[in-house]
Amino acid sequence: MKHLNHVFLLFVFAFSLFSCGNKNDKKEYNKEEAQVETDTTMAQKTEADELSDSPRHHEWVTLSHGEREFQAFVAYPETNEATKSVIVIHENRGLNDWARLFADKLAEAGYLVIAPDLISNTQGKRRTTDFENPDAARDAIYALDPEQVTADLDVAFNYIKEDSASTGEVAVVGFCWGGSQTFKYAINNQEISSAHVFYGTGPEEASAIANISAPIYGYYGGDDNRVNSTIEASEKMMEDAGKTYKYEIYEGAGHAFMRSGHQPEAEKPNKEAHDKAWKRLKDLLK
């Protein structure tokens, strides 16, 4: 009988250990599972989701000149005072979700922002998002008439400058193709307060530089050889003309680091370049 009691007690003790072990393992498993679920949710959150979650007011406006009509995305800061304004010129993918999210982030920083969709109402498509894929949008970008692009930007400039929520001071920020257009627009519009060129090229003709009145600020990835090979010539032309051209090159970052550096899975150099460039941009816009 004593022997049976001893066996029974051993069985109960072993069962208790086994039960506690399972309970702790399950608790640890749930913690790990929850972390994986959180990380996955963050990684899967798209630019469209972030835009949808934004508390700021967004609206589409229809602008026109001559017989052309085009769309522009406007993002308002949360303030009761007039603010400085910014024109965002999209990259060669058109006014996609990322470009609109960037406009929203500038509004979060306190600026009234307009982002014209420069391929809207071209090739039978009302907006960039109506194109079949980024390649189709890119083809439409490179088919644009340069004079039409300038006219579109002029209309966007006047619209945002005259908005009652604007102080009338307007800066321009552009990326890739839009960065090159930003440099060019500084030649065509002497009223802009500053031009911010993200991995875009400068003009090839030195004579055009004479028309620039705003300071030009460049933001370049260290591994973007195609664009960076043009910096020295731009710097010389600007210096010879007595114009302001200041730039930073972010070591290890590639082309389009502002878009790629925003992604959850961004490589470290692109992420660091993204963060440094954001801080610099906001400091310069103040």
What are these regions (language model features)?
Residues S164-F175:
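Alpha/beta-hydrolase fold nucleophile elbow
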Residues T244-K286:
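C-terminal catalytic histidine-bearing segment of alpha/beta-hydrolase fold enzymes
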Residues G21-N24:
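Bacterial signal peptide processing site
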Residues G174-G178, T182:
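Gly/Ala-rich beta-loop-alpha elbow adjacent to hydrolase catalytic centers
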Residues E191-T201:
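A conserved short beta-strand
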Residues S16-S19:
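C-terminal motif of bacterial Sec signal peptides marking the signal peptidase cleavage site
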Residues Y217-Y220:
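Short beta-strand/loop motif that positions the catalytic acidic residue
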Residues Y29-E47, L51, L63-K161, R259-H262:
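Serine-hydrolase catalytic machinery in alpha/beta-hydrolase-like enzymes
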